[in-house]
């Protein structure tokens, strides 16, 4: 029992040590504006006043705020941020205040190539114009000379002309002698000349800054303008003597414009300069090849599909003809009805003069070969009930067909005579055991089967047509005759 108590005590002490000992009490910061809720919302943090910065993430009072160049900015998180100092090579643009940081920029003569927030990460030197741009050449820029202004800049800073920039002013042509030259200029150039003439300011003439006049040759105008430029620190003179109202640079400007105009007329213009679109022969050749390939493949597939369709149609047509016109075995009803009637008549007719019934042939006597007319012969039942003369007596089942192995039946020749009687060759029949013909004895059957073997009229010998149904005929003499010949069988 004591061991259990000790174990419970140790467990209780471990649980007490698991709780934090210096956990602050939960407070609310709604009453005091100088405090704001901390990140965990369990305590309040002191809000540093303007000009003070906190010394810890969550200051607890004024003692934790210190006075320095640190800026206390009230942002969205209500935290204080420090003021930044400008890096070497940067100058202060705007000082640090209670609600805005310090803004730094590059020194004079430099420009910011990599901007940063309220500062610049990399400054690069500015360039000035070394050679101005012409109709054939772009502006050539260079680093400023040591004699430049204090800020390291020059009025002719290197700038790339774009569609949004306004071109430099061109002096107006006030001399009547220059009307013919003005007519050669395009309308846009004359408009720019008229607009820029109002902005020109006359500068006193000086011999050192006076630019030399170009040579009369238009081809040397560009060289004169390029090589003879005033020093970088001076401004070229754009005016002449007081007696003349035309600027000194008018002639050179006009010569340049006329030269550019005439050269543009004489030289063939390219599609890129005129702005007209043109087709690349490489891409056109590719698209033409693709179109030809697509058309060829489509035509090949269509022809192949048509050939396959014709082949399938022929195959399906043959199959349809085979299924539609397939020969079928003729049934009992397909045989001529009159032949069946004649068969019934020949088997049941009685001789009125003799007064006795003719004995019918046994089933083996009418059997033929297996290959000719077996369908109709097998389906024709022998009417044995008609022998007794009772048409309403129950019909006995037909005799099973006797195979050729148990009989020696053989019809040698068939002769068709002009008389009503058909004579057939000798027929020998083996009667199955245990069965005798009804209404006759063996002697009478042998007497009836004795037939004349002498052939008659061999020229009338016929053969049964192929595909015809085998006909079994029993020819019976009419009732008025006295000669009672045996019933004969014919097979066509």
UniProtKB/Swiss-Prot annotation:
Subcellular location: Cell membrane
Keyword flag Transferase: no
Gene Ontology MF term list: protease binding; transmembrane signaling receptor activity
Residues listed as glycosylation sites in the UniProt record: 151, 178, 224
Keyword Repeat in record: yes
TNFR-Cys repeats: from-to residues: 57-104, 105-141
Bias (Basic and acidic residues): 450-459, 478-492
Keywords: Cell membrane, Disulfide bond, Glycoprotein, Membrane, Phosphoprotein, Receptor, Repeat, Signal, Transmembrane, Transmembrane helix
Annotated S-S bridges: 58-80, 83-96, 86-104, 123-141
Listed Polar residues bias regions: 160-178, 339-360
Biased composition, class Low complexity, residue ranges: 144-155
Subunit structure: Interacts with TRAF1, TRAF2, TRAF3 and TRAF5.
Function: Receptor for TNFSF8/CD30L. May play a role in the regulation of cellular growth and transformation of activated lymphoblasts. Regulates gene expression through activation of NF-kappa-B.
Name used for this protein in its record: Tumor necrosis factor receptor superfamily member 8
Gene giving rise to this polypeptide: Tnfrsf8
């Amino acid at each position: 029992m004591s061991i259990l108590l000790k174990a419970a005590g140790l467990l209780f002490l471990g649980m007490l040590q698991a709780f934090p000992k210096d956990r602050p009490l939960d407070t609310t910061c709604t009453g005091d504006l100088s405090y704001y809720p901390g990140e965990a919302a369990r305590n309040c943090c002191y809000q540093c006043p303007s000009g003070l910065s906190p010394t810890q993430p969550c200051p607890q009072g004024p003692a934790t705020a210190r006075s320095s160049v640190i800026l206390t900015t009230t942002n969205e998180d209500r935290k204080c941020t420090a003021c930044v100092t400008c890096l070497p090579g940067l100058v202060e643009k705007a000082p640090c205040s209670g609600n805005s940081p310090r803004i730094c920029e590059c020194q004079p003569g430099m420009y910011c190539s990599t901007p940063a927030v309220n500062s610049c990460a990399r400054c690069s030197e500015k360039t000035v114009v070394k050679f101005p741009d012409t109709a054939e050449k772009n502006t050539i820029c260079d680093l400023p000379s040591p004699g430049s202004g204090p800020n390291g800049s020059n009025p002719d800073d290197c700038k790339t002309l774009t569609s949004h920039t306004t071109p430099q002013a061109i002096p107006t042509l006030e001399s009547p002698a220059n009307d013919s030259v003005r007519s050669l200029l395009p309308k846009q150039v004359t408009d720019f000349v008229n607009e820029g003439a109002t902005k020109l300011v006359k500068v006193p003439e000086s011999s050192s800054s006076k630019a030399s006049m170009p040579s009369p040759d238009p081809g040397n105008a560009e060289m004169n303008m390029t090589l003879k430029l005033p020093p970088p620190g001076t401004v070229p003179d754009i005016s002449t003597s007081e007696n003349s109202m035309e600027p000194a640079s008018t002639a050179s400007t006009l010569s340049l414009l006329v030269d550019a105009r005439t050269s543009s007329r004489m030289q063939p213009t390219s599609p890129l300069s005129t702005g007209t679109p043109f087709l690349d022969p490489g891409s056109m050749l590719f698209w033409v090849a693709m179109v030809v390939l697509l058309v060829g493949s489509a035509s090949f597939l269509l022809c192949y599909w048509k050939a396959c369709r014709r082949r399938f149609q022929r195959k399906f047509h043959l199959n349809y003809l085979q299924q539609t016109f397939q020969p079928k075995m003729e049934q009992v009803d397909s045989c001529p009805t009159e032949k069946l009637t004649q068969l019934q008549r020949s088997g049941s007719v009685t001789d009125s003069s003799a007064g006795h019934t003719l004995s019918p042939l046994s089933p083996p006597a009418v059997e033929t070969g297996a290959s000719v007319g077996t369908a109709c012969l097998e389906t024709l039942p022998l009417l044995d009930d008609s022998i007794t003369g009772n048409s309403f007596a129950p019909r006995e089942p037909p005799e099973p067909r006797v195979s050729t192995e148990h009989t020696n039946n053989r019809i040698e020749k068939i002769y068709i005579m002009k008389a009503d009687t058909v004579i057939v060759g000798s027929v020998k029949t083996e009667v199955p055991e245990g069965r005798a013909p009804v209404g006759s004895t063996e002697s009478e059957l042998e007497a009836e089967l004795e037939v004349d073997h002498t052939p008659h009229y061999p020229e009338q010998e016929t053969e049964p047509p192929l595909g015809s149904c085998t006909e079994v005929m029993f020819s019976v003499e009419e009732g008025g005759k006295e000669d009672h010949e045996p019933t004969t069988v014919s097979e066509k």
